[in-house]
């Protein structure tokens, strides 16, 4: 079995390389092209030479014409090779002398057989022609596929992303995902290490092509999933380009006093990575961490994707200020990057601060169905001003050896928020015309500190071949914690009036809330217990024993007071003032049984099967002690929550990879204190939630089936995935609502009859490569159907809900000069409460994009989004268009300077329109948004690579 595991990566990459070779240089005119065939052999033993690199060049210019690898039988066949001109072929293989053979294809025969070429080992005298300094475009190095960057000529300002797009069989998709002949790259590494957190875009858009020595593709031998091992890509830099400095400093000013500034300075070396970033603007460019700002400030960061354009979907007017730094330090000794898994010894940290000021004006309209053709028509006008500040730091440490792994991480976030809000609401019953109004004001300040972290140790059993005894054990030990502390002071002023004046209510209520809580989780997993009693291999079931226990506590202190009319001091509210201590214990114990099977044939196929069953039980205890005695609750539950899965993988090297999986698992949702016995605040006049101590846990059954296909046949990959699932929930927890004629509602959670749902998700992507052109087609879609029971005004209604989302896009690129995109997006939902209500809502969006960038010169990009919205409560569709455009010029050496003119929301049509559907209501909300402005931006991109140059 272990032998099979070692063979699989080698077979896979050999086949991958062979097919990469078939994705050759650009096709020629079929009238003036021919074929070249031949055979490669080892001169000493007369073996056929597998995976030898064959490259054809023009004699007069040494331009590369085409290249490929020999197959399992040492043969090669070139098609579409120009006829009637002098050519030569260069053959290379690791451990052998390179050889050269000159030839010319006759225009009459349009084919030539080069017969047998013999390759000699490096330590033998050379009888054929030796080619010194001639590098093959690609080759096999052990089980690693290598591309030589110098064999591919690109613009002097090209970056790694441009290089990868020029490599045969490699596709860089529009979202940054990389595939090699359809196989998704799990990690893009630089010098065997993640590059600034592992975001592909940072390496693709910043590292220059001329700093790259080679690109390696290999399977992760140590992937814990033997059925579906992951594939990595490693960028090897030239010896004199191992370190570098890059960044951006930019500022823009535009109409209506709009402004935007951002900066980044990044340094990397073989052991150290450091980046400092910052941004400030009032044009809805908001980032949540250092990685986002690094991605937005990339050297080739602009295009038609609108990664760092204004977010016109964000509501309100926003002023953002943020900045931070990230660093990583590698303490491991220098080693082959392909073996870096066992050499990992890395520390990484980040600190990030953000300050966001938001002012939002919102209008909403809600239609609530009450049955018997009765409806509530509710409107609301809201004004909110908030300021949110946060300071977050986090760090990770990882160390791996051949038989053990240590992981540790932490995160601390301090946040402060100040908010003020006013709300004017009305409710009208269309049957009896009863009407009510509510005016509410809220002022709140909140300070919170959240901390989390984990520490884990994994050990691997290995065999001492001298004593034939097992050493160590396969085990996982992990501890995680989440802690929170918050203080909140707030005041609510409410004035409720109605046509029936006896129902008028007035509140001036003050709240002081303090919360301290935390969760501590301990994971213990002993793997492959049966292997402890066997010396060689494991011929029986693999048995794992696992236990996960979580201890949660939350202490809450609420002080609530009311200010009576004419009074000057707040009187304590005895119903809402409370001290509570909530604790839960969640313990899951299981026995995990699994069995793997393999069937392989070198360079042909690999088939694998895996079956597992997880026999797991769960014990859940909850206890709440409170000053309000009705909240004193103590409950214990125990459930059997099994899971099972069958996975089959079929890799036909050079053809396809298929993955099938079928499975079933269970889970339990337990009632919370806020559902069982909440504190009822009657100042929330329009919506009050009361408790239900009879609420039972909901038990969920989930069955699923997945199918994934990856094409490995040619340079035009087709990949797709289909996911199906079905859910059945026993004792489903649902909302029970009671409305009065004034629009006031009382909500209560209840257990209803079984709920059912079914879901579909899928995606497909196809790429076409021809010469310097690439066309990408991608689509993904999802559908969800559910049936459940709700209760409105004491009557049960069967509710059927549907939702559908679908999008498709076509993305075209020509070299790194032209880009174009056309896309369609649909998102719709429907809710049908049998005998009560029917609501529908959908959004259509069409987006068009075009961009070009002349080398070291002018660039232009534009994007148009056409939006169409329709709801069942509106008489007409709502249409609006967002059109943005940029034109700019790159100057200075290395295109390090930039001036850009941006036109945003050119048609001045941007709107914020959102729809929410519940079982018996439909809400449409509009808000103020950022609209048309123009801006001029200046930017400088410092770029220096090879700060401490070493000789090759």
Task: Show the residue positions of the predicted features.
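Short Pro-Gly-centered beta-turn/loop motif in secreted/extracellular proteins
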Residues: 49, 77-85
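Primarily recognizes Gram-negative and organellar outer-membrane beta-barrels
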Residues: 70, 198-201, 219-259, 272-952
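Periplasmic plug
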Residues: 177-221, 234-237, 272
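Extracellular beta-sheet/turn segments enriched in Thr/Pro/Gly and aliphatic residues
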Residues: 24-30, 105-133, 232-236, 935
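Structural motif
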Residues: 31, 37-49
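A short, solvent-exposed loop/turn motif at the edges and junctions
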Residues: 58-63, 85-102
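Short, acidic Ser/Thr/Gly-rich low-complexity loop/linker segments typical of extracellular
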Residues: 60-75
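Short, acidic, small-residue-rich periplasmic hinge/interaction motif at the N-terminus
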Residues: 41-44, 53-57, 90-94, 112-153, ...
């Amino acid at each position: 079995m272990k032998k099979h595991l070692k063979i699989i990566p080698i077979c896979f990459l050999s086949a991958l390389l062979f097919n990469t070779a078939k994705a050759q240089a650009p096709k020629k005119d079929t009238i003036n092209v021919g074929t070249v065939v031949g055979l490669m052999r080892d001169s000493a033993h007369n073996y056929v030479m597998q995976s030898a690199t064959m490259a054809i060049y023009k004699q007069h210019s040494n331009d590369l014409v085409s290249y490929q690898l020999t197959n399992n039988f040492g043969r090669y066949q070139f098609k579409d090779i120009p006829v009637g001109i002098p050519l030569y072929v260069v053959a290379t293989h690791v451990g052998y002398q390179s050889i050269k053979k000159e030839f010319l294809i006759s225009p009459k025969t349009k084919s030539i057989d080069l017969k047998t070429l013999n390759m000699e080992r490096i330590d033998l005298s050379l009888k054929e022609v030796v080619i010194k300094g001639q590098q093959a475009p690609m080759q096999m190095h052990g089980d690693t596929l290598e591309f030589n960057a110098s064999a591919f000529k690109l613009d002097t300002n090209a970056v790694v992303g441009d290089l990868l797009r020029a490599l045969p069989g490699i596709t860089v998709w529009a979202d940054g995902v990389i595939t090699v002949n359809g196989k998704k790259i799990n990690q893009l590494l630089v010098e065997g290490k993640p590059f600034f957190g592992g975001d592909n875009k940072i390496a693709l858009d910043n590292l220059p092509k001329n700093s790259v020595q080679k690109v390696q593709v290999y399977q992760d031998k140590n992937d814990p999933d033997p059925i579906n091992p992951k594939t990595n890509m490693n960028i090897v830099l030239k010896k004199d380009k191992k370190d570098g400095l890059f960044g951006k400093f930019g500022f823009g000013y535009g109409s209506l006093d709009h402004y935007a500034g951002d900066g980044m300075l990044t340094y990397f070396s073989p052991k150290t990575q450091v980046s400092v970033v910052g941004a400030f603007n009032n044009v809805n460019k908001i980032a949540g961490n250092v990685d986002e700002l690094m991605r937005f400030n990339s050297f080739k960061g602009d295009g038609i994707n609108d990664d760092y354009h204004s977010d016109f979907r964000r509501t309100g007017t926003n002023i953002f200020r943020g900045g931070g730094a990230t660093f990583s330090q590698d303490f491991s000794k220098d080693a082959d990057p392909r073996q870096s898994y066992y050499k990992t010894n890395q520390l990484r940290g980040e600190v990030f601060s953000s300050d966001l000021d938001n002012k939002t004006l919102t209008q909403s309209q809600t239609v609530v169905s009450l049955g018997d053709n009765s409806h509530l028509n509710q409107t609301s006008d809201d004004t909110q001003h908030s300021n949110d500040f946060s300071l977050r730091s986090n760090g990770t440490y990882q160390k791996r050896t051949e038989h053990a792994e240590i992981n540790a991480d932490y995160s601390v976030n301090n946040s402060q928020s100040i908010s003020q809000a006013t709300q004017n609401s009305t409710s009208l019953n269309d049957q009896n015309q009863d009407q009510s109004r509510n005016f509410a004001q809220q002022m709140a300040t909140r300070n919170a500190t959240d901390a989390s972290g984990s520490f884990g140790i994994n050990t691997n059993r290995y065999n001492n071949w001298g004593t034939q005894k097992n050493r160590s054990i396969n085990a996982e030990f992990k501890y995680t914690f989440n802690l929170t502390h918050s203080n909140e002071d707030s005041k609510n002023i409410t004035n409720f009036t109605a046509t029936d004046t006896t129902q008028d209510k007035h509140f001036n209520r003050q709240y002081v809330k303090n919360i301290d809580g935390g969760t501590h989780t301990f994971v213990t997993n002993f793997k492959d217990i049966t292997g402890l009693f066997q010396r060689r291999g494991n011929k029986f079931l693999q048995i794992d024993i696992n236990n996960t226990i979580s201890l949660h506590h939350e202490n809450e202190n609420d002080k609530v007071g009311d200010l009576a009319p004419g009074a000057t001091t707040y009187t304590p509210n005895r119903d809402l003032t409370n001290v509570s201590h909530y604790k839960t214990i969640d313990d899951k114990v299981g026995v995990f049984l699994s069995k793997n099977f393999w069937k392989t044939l070198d360079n042909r196929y690999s088939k694998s099967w895996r079956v597992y069953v997880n026999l797991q039980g769960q014990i859940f205890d909850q206890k709440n002690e409170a000053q309000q005695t009705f909240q004193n609750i103590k409950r214990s539950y125990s459930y059997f929550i099994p899971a099972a899965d069958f996975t089959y993988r079929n890799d036909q090297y050079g053809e396809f990879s298929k993955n099938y999986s079928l499975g079933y698992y269970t889970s339990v949702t337990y009632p919370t204190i806020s559902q069982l016995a909440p504190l009822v605040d009657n100042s929330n006049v329009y919506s009050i939630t009361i408790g239900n101590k009879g609420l039972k846990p909901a038990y969920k059954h989930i069955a699923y089936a997945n199918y994934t296909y990856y094409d490995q046949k040619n340079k035009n990959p087709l990949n797709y995935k289909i996911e199906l699932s079905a859910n059945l929930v026993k004792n489903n927890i649902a909302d029970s609502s009671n409305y009065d004629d004034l629009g006031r509602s009382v909500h209560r959670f209840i257990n209803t009859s079984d709920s059912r749902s079914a879901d579909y998700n899928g995606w497909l992507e196809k790429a076409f490569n021809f010469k310097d052109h690439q066309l990408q087609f991608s689509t993904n879609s999802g559908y969800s159907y559910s049936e459940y029971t709700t209760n409105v005004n004491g009557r049960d209604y069967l509710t059927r809900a549907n939702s559908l989302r679908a999008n498709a896009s076509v993305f075209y690129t020509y070299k790194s000069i032209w880009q174009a995109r056309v896309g369609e997006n649909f998102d719709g939902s429907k809710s049908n409460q049998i005998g009560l209500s029917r609501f529908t809502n959908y959004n259509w969006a069409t987006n068009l994009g075009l961009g070009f960038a002349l080398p070291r010169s002018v660039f232009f990009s534009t994007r148009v989004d056409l939006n169409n919205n329709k709801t069942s409560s509106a008489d007409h569709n709502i249409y609006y268009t967002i059109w943005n455009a940029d034109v700019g010029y790159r100057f200075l050496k290395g295109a390090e300077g930039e001036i850009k003119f941006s036109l945003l929301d050119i048609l001045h049509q941007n709107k914020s329109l959102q729809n929410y559907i519940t079982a018996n209501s439909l809400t449409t909300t509009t808000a103020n948004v950022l609209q048309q402005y123009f801006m001029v931006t200046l930017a400088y991109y410092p770029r220096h690579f090879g700060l401490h140059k070493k000789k090759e």
